Amino acid sequence: MFRQDALENRKMKWQGRAILLPGIPLWLIMLGSIVFITAFLMFIIVGTYSRRVNVSGEVTTWPRAVNIYSGVQGFVVRQFVHEGQLIKKGDPVYLIDISKSTRSGIVTDNHRRDIENQLVRVDNIISRLEESKKITLDTLEKQRLQYTDAFRRSSDIIQRAEEGIKIMKNNMENYRNYQAKGLINKDQLTNQVALYYQQQNNLLSLSGQNEQNALQITTLESQIQTQAADFDNRIYQMELQRYELQKELVNTDVEGEIIIRALTDGKVDSLSVTVGQMVNTGDSLLQVIPENIENYYLILWVPNDAVPYISAGDKVNIRYEAFPAEKFGQFSATVKTISRTPASTQEMLTYKGAPQNTPGASVPWYKVIAMPEKQIIRYDEKYLPLENGMKAESTLFLEKRRIYQWMLSPFYDMKHSATGPLND
């Protein structure tokens, strides 16, 4: 009764009735298999699938928001703008003090004071030179005028003397005729001849004096030109020295205080430093956004294996990090421009959402600009605008193939790996 076989037999005994159902007909199984195989073949032959890739990016505007950095090290001593203020290109933003101090005071102030004193002395020297030039040239001009008057008077006297000598010469010739006719004696003729030659000698003396006056006029004119040129050269040398001092004064200002100016028109979005704060070279000072933003754009970074399949006008799906897809869904955008050269590292560093290349795994990235169709997102009776720098993820739709082609793609790889050298 307690044998093992009896116990096993008791366990295997059925407790109820067995109902045998009729089997599925063969023709139904065949029909179902044919329908399934036909549908599967139609699906893989007719159906298509687009390869897609997810890339990162961020929202921006054109022109972009401008970050102004400090080019010097110093202390902020004055702030000219406030957040939200509209500014124009060239407007002052910050005043930074970069001067150094010693026991004798501020170095730049002392240097500036010395240069200003030198400039005052140089200006005084130039003024005295100009005054001396005027006095010297006026004196020489007066002498020239005096000699000119003397030359004119002596010329008039010589002209009248020449006329008188001509008359005396005629009288002498008449006396010769009178003496030949016996009307006068020889002594009278001799007196007349002596008087004529005496007047001739006087004329020669007047001519010599007249020539001396003309020569003196020429000498004075030459002195006027020489003295003027000499004074001009000396004044020019002093002006050059003043110009060098002025340049040195400008350099002193550069070493004392630096004014940071706006580089573009726009609105001050944020100020990074306050008065009294120390800044180093490369520190961010403020951000300026465009005054009127017409459109927001999406900057996408696409790897090199995807960029050949993208063209302007393609649609892409966008998911904003600020607007989760679980709540807001995906948004549509249109590709506007595609760069055909890889973006440089310096350019990518200016975008916070750009991918970072790791050492040993450098990937060429191409910049693609897309325009979202919705610039403002409506949610719960509110309008939520896009903002600069918002991170986003986009799905790009690349090449489109039949499903069977995607299924056979591993065999294409095997074919390429087994192919020998190509002979073009």
Curated annotation (Swiss-Prot):
One Gene Ontology cellular component? plasma membrane
Q: Name one Pfam family in it.
A: HlyD_3
Gene3D superfamilies xref list:
2.40.50.100
Membrane-crossing residue ranges in chain numbering: 26-46
User: Periplasmic side: which ranges?
Assistant: 47-424
Keyword Cell membrane applies: yes
For the biological process aspect of GO, one term held by this record is: protein secretion
**Which family would the database say this protein is a member of?**
Belongs to the membrane fusion protein (MFP) (TC 8.A.1) family.
| Protein name stated in the entry | Microcin H47 secretion protein MchE
Please report the organism this UniProt entry assigns to the protein: Escherichia coli
